[in-house]
């Protein structure tokens, strides 16, 4: 039998029967019995168990991520009512993210079995948290639209089944650790889509992995793609560019092997980052501009008192003129500088480089390459950003009004900012599609609105109103 030596307070103090203590019944009532069990399970047996309500809240937040996967599935399953009783997924129809999640679930299942056999439940808890994060912040995030789009029912069913396999496996694996939460999910998730399942999660055999799936290195490809997304997101944050603001180009400087790995996820990368194009480059110099400066050591004898005048001339040259001069200097030709009568030897100039305007970059881990963003915003990109900001605010007011996800609505958007209204008029069909809106009033309001709200979009106030269609 393995057990922890003692339970101590979260700040390291010892509990006492006559002094500071937390009664189990009180803790179970306040943070839940499963949370208490989860805290204990997550502590290595070689250490004392630290226990307290702050740690309990942290553990509960981690369990909430698992719960939210169930909530997401349940929300859309209420509409579509998927049933897997006699369902066999078409593996050839699976997307790369589908294959990744099945392979990732098999991997989690294998690790969980080994850790249970080794009595290393605390390591299982950590693996579970990583697995839940993978499902939430990669699979669901990149496949959300598949669960509510209409038309391709086969693809939607595949997405349901893959998510079911992952969530069901996690529920079975974690049932000894968090028995009450897993039982609730079993009854309200597994037995709804697979009615012939055992009547309790605690009466099940150990789950079996899905065999016969060609992964083709999908786990590594996914890891590289996620790193590119995370790095580019960090660059966005540093430049204070919201994800809803589209950008023109993502540059990835890498070798051909890395480029091939992420090729299958190009669309997902661009969608996640809200960027129009991805360009692969083999040298970061592509992201730099060359320009000339005066080589003072040599130029002094030639230009004498006109050295600073030449410096000022170079600083005011157009981009085209500078490009021509740089090319001439690099070839060692004599150089004619606009505004000057004489030609000059190439050695009185120095070729320098600087990052192109609007380009920001960062290196990937382990020398895998460099990621760069073009942050220059054109009028079209700015208008599209206004539209996406407006759609986001409208989605929030829909939710605040308490509508079901499938509810058709009427929406009104009123603003004194003509730039906002002008941008919205160009994208009315897109806006209606995103909001499930049968009617969209721009520049007016609704007489029967269920909820009206004023929000900030762009540089001004926008008044939103929503009603059921």
Summary of predicted features, one role per range:
Residues 47-55:
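Short, solvent-exposed helix-loop connector elements
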